[in-house]
Regions:
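Alpha-helical adaptor scaffolds
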Residues: 159-179, 183-191, 204-250
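Residue register of alpha-helical TPR repeats
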Residues: 15, 50-57, 104, 109-111, ...
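Short coil/turn linkers that connect adjacent helices within long alpha-helical scaffolds
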Residues: 7, 41-46, 96, 147-152, ...
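Structural motif corresponding to the intra-repeat A-B loop/turn of tetratricopeptide repeats
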Residues: 27, 62, 116, 170-171, ...
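C-terminal non-catalytic interaction modules
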Residues: 1-21, 25-28, 255, 260-314
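Structural register within alpha-helical repeat arrays
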Residues: 20, 55, 59-62, 109, ...
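Helix-turn-helix repeat elements of alpha-solenoid scaffolds
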Residues: 22-38, 63-91, 126-143, 170-182, ...
Length: 314
């Protein structure tokens, strides 16, 4: 008897395919999400652009959590497909959906640029010292432009979120960042539905992820100011929202912050036991950056330590 392999092809609505890949991406199943998207066949420029954008976002999150280097070629490919889409309009004005696609691509480029600044040779590096000042300034300008061009409130909220991250982690402007996080929080809680990408897809989980991210960083500022009760409130809610949205690696990284509060309260044994499990779980799913953060905590590193301000030349 000879076994023969056959490939079964079936038609699936594009929105459902991308939504399924999005759930896999958020859950940390980046390879499976990529294979699913790459298996899709599309014949029109818009569908090809949407598939390429979704694949680029999977690659970007794999780079962030898994320490891979996959996003750059995926972003380049997505850029080409978006160019083809815009060229296909042949002078006709772009509709709202196509404007959303262009914004989403630009936002992925912002996120990739930010990652390149805070992750250097595999190490998370914050603060302005030893950094070309033009690069953070360009990211800030990029995020400001995205905020101004955002087609809806959730996307505007994500631009605000990255303005806060750039201020916090690249410029060490700790007094500036919270205002951006508060604006992001308001946008996420308002619940305007976005399109594709981090700000869109499933209405609830898209909003949940933005609210989670804002609460995560606002809680960090609460912690720095010694308001541990407020930090716990925000971090606990962020953990809950992340779990509801299905972000497995993000929820693990959030639990590390809760362990910081356990350590602050004097329960070192409890904090260590908690983070030891987080490190094990993160390693099991390939979330290498979260595992490294957890192992740093076990070695005594404070993951909430603020970046140092720029040293004066005087």
């Amino acid at each position: 008897m000879t076994n023969t392999a056959s490939t079964l092809r079936t038609a699936v609505p594009l929105d459902e395919l991308i939504a399924a890949a999005r759930e896999l991406r958020i859950g940390g199943r980046w390879e499976r999400a990529t294979r699913l998207l790459d298996s899709g066949e599309a014949t029109d420029p818009r569908s090809r652009a949407l598939l390429a954008l979704a694949a680029a976002e999977v690659a970007l999150e794999s780079d962030w959590f898994g320490g891979t280097a996959l996003a750059e070629p995926r972003l380049a490919a997505a850029g080409l497909f978006v160019e083809v889409l815009l060229a296909s309009l042949d002078g006709k004005p772009a509709d709202e959906a196509q404007s959303d696609i262009r914004w989403d691509l630009d936002f992925l480029r912002l996120r990739h640029g930010y990652l390149g600044q805070v992750r250097v040779d595999g190490v998370f590096r914050v603060g302005p010292d030893g950094r070309d000042p033009d690069a953070p300034a360009a990211l800030r300008t990029h995020a400001e432009r995205l905020r101004g061009e955002a087609p809806d409130g959730v996307r505007r909220g994500w631009a605000e979120m990255y303005l806060g991250l750039v201020a916090d982690n690249l410029f060490a402007e700790r007094d500036v960042a919270p205002g951006h996080y508060e604006a992001a929080l308001c946008a996420g809680e308002a619940g305007e539905a976005g399109g594709t990408g981090e700000a869109g897809g499933s209405h609830n989980s898209g909003d949940d992820l933005l609210v989670r991210e804002a609460l995560r960083h606002l809680g960090d500022h609460d912690h720095d100011h010694g308001d541990h009760a407020r930090a716990r409130e925000r971090w606990s809610r962020a953990t809950e929202l992340g779990a509801r949205a299905g972000t497995v690696p993000g929820t693990l990284s959030q639990q590390v912050l809760l362990a910081v509060l356990t350590r602050d309260a004097g329960d070192e044994a409890g904090a260590v036991a908690m983070v030891r499990e987080i490190a094990r779980w993160a390693g099991a799913i390939g979330a290498m950056t979260t595992e490294a953060q957890a192992r740093g905590f076990l070695a005594g590193v404070d993951p909430t330590a603020p970046p140092a301000p720029a040293e004066s030349d005087s």
